[in-house]
């Protein structure tokens, strides 16, 4: 099977150039030798969960704060300037048991070294039922939550949640609790999975109910994107620029800002 091989250092990596966020200093709250995620997406650049089982532990709050401060200090001394500090990496950041405290530390260090930098969290939304996670996400500049579709069968086929209790309708209701302080991120792609199932979610069957959900959530922005790196399943294809632009314009007609990454 074709396998992606990107596993990020932990707890700090980069800075890297992000298509969506600019010069990004990464914060990885997962082990440096594997992947820990509540989704097992067929398009994940880090590969499948079962093939990336870590032996190391997650970094502690103290380890994250120390590594982040050291890196920010060096960047300041070297004249480097990050646009954004981004929680991403090898899995779901909000699952860290000290996530809220780590966000508090990050805000403090950002304000000390680069007060103009934004703090972003890339999340699959599976822990937003926790009040502490929601409090933390309200403190960051870019609360970026995944919503690839509202179709449960498509989610089961492509995002593959680890929990059988995952309910996209409940996720949408929880997203509404941010009262607009949320950016919705959606992957659009084409092709087939390894079982030959069509994974094209660019048509109206998927886009129309997704737009209805966006109207409910009322996000400050929507980010749509497509495959840019290697994927663990061989038959996945990029959505075209024209298709993404057409979806972007439909979002904008709702009065919601939308960016597309090709």
For each predicted feature, which ranges?
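Auxiliary Fe-S-binding modules of radical SAM enzymes
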Residues: 2-20, 73, 190-262
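Canonical Radical SAM [4Fe-4S] cluster-binding loop centered on the CxxxCxxC motif
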Residues: 21-66
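Short hydrophobic-acidic sequence motifs that mark active-site Asp/Glu residues
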Residues: 24-26, 84, 144, 183
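Short, well-ordered amphipathic alpha-helices
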Residues: 27, 66-74, 102-109, 211
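Short strand->helix junction
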Residues: 34, 92-93
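Conserved alpha-helical substructure of the radical SAM core
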Residues: 48-84, 98-101
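Short glycine-rich or small-residue beta-strand-to-loop segments that form or flank ligand, phosphate
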Residues: 85-90
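Conserved AdoMet/S-adenosylmethionine-binding subsite of the radical SAM
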Residues: 95-237
